UniProtKB/Swiss-Prot annotation:
Source species taxonomy: Bacteria, Bacillati, Actinomycetota, Actinomycetes, Streptosporangiales
Family: Belongs to the UbiA prenyltransferase family. Protoheme IX farnesyltransferase subfamily.
Pathway(s) served: Porphyrin-containing compound metabolism; heme O biosynthesis; heme O from protoheme: step 1/1
Keyword Transcription: no
Name of the featured protein: Protoheme IX farnesyltransferase
Statement: the UniProt record of this protein carries the keyword Glycoprotein: no
Annotated GO biological process: heme O biosynthetic process
């Protein structure tokens, strides 16, 4: 969600024929680079890496092989960036209509649609080839599935049609967990699927908390996010239910992955904090609190911290287990 400075007006058609592949000739090199970085949505990628790195530690039962880990992170970043860039191409009309996203490069015409697609497709091809050559076929296949699911299922099929868009569309955001595990073990087991479900159930309340803050944006863009089409009470009830599912599923990793006590204790403590905040907001809604008085962004930031710290515990646990042996 990088914000770029507003450039002088440019001729889109001229930009499309630019030798730089889609950025106006008048654009500086710095603006050119920043625009393409912004297309990748770095903050979204950061979140994906938060889940990829820890699962490799669990899969390796300690520190993963450095070469495989670095390759997975590099090509995983490229894979996510490709999907995000193509998403920017498809959703450029929505981005122009929303205050939160109207400074994205495609919305501001810093990068042309043609340049955006070339960038996205190139990254998709390079990431897939990189996974095949430097990691393994299973990780490559999962990466391709994640890109295709995000573009065709979430962006094209679900986002503009259903209030459950982020529920099922969130599957793409869960894939780095499986990719990280497959990169190390060349197979899939129950443990990564538990962490997959943690991210799956975590995504809707996290996203809806943000959408409640920007519901007018989504309404203006005709995106039927749950906070746009449902009451605050309904939204917060679902946030509570999905938060409970997140916490319960997170505890299943303890017996399935045979962790030390560090992980379940951390998961329980973090879960109590997450649930307390979700219930607090729900109770406020039931008491009639609404609008700006309902501090949903606090829950949004807390849920970010919850997931990050949970996966820190996932990372540390196998290291502790090795130290105790």
């Amino acid at each position: 969600m990088t914000l770029l400075g507003r450039p002088a007006a440019t001729d889109t058609c001229a930009a499309a024929d630019s030798p730089t592949g889609g950025v106006s000739r008048s654009a500086s090199l710095g603006t050119y680079i920043r625009a393409y970085i912004a297309l990748s949505k770095p903050r979204v990628i950061e979140l994906l890496l938060i889940t990829t790195i820890p699962v490799m530690f669990v899969a390796a039962q300690g520190v993963p092989p450095l070469g495989i880990a670095v390759a997975t992170l590099v090509f995983g970043t490229m894979s996510a960036a490709s999907a995000n860039a193509i998403n920017c191409y498809i959703d450029r009309d929505i981005d122009r209509a929303m205050r939160r996203t109207r400074r994205r490069p495609t919305a501001m015409e810093q990068v042309t649609p043609r340049g955006t697609m070339i960038y996205g497709i190139t990254l998709a091809v390079l990431s897939t080839v990189g996974f095949v050559v430097f990691v393994n076929w299973l990780a490559a296949a999962l990466s391709v599935f994640a890109i295709a699911f995000y573009i065709f299922v979430y962006t094209l099929l679900l986002k503009r049609r259903t209030a459950q868009n982020v529920v099922w569309g969130g599957i793409a955001g869960c894939m780095p967990v499986l990719i990280g595990w497959a990169a190390i073990t060349e197979r899939l087991d129950w443990a990564p699927f538990i962490l997959f479900l943690v991210v799956f159930f975590w995504t809707p309340p996290h996203t809806w908390a943000l959408a409640m803050r920007y519901r007018e944006d989504y309404a203006a863009a005709n995106v039927p996010m749950l906070p746009v089409v449902a009451s605050d009470r309904r939204v917060m009830l679902e946030c509570v239910l999905y938060s409970w599912a997140t916490v319960v599923v997170s505890l299943l990793l303890w017996p399935i992955a045979d962790t030390t006590l560090l992980y379940p204790v951390a998961a329980a403590v973090l879960g109590v904090i997450l649930l307390a905040q979700a219930h607090r907001l729900y109770n406020q809604v039931r008491a009639g609190v609404s609008g700006s008085k309902l501090k949903t962004m606090g829950f949004f930031h807390l849920s970010n911290a919850y997931l990050a710290l949970l996966f820190v515990a996932v990372t540390i646990d196998p290291l502790l287990a090795n130290a105790l042996r």
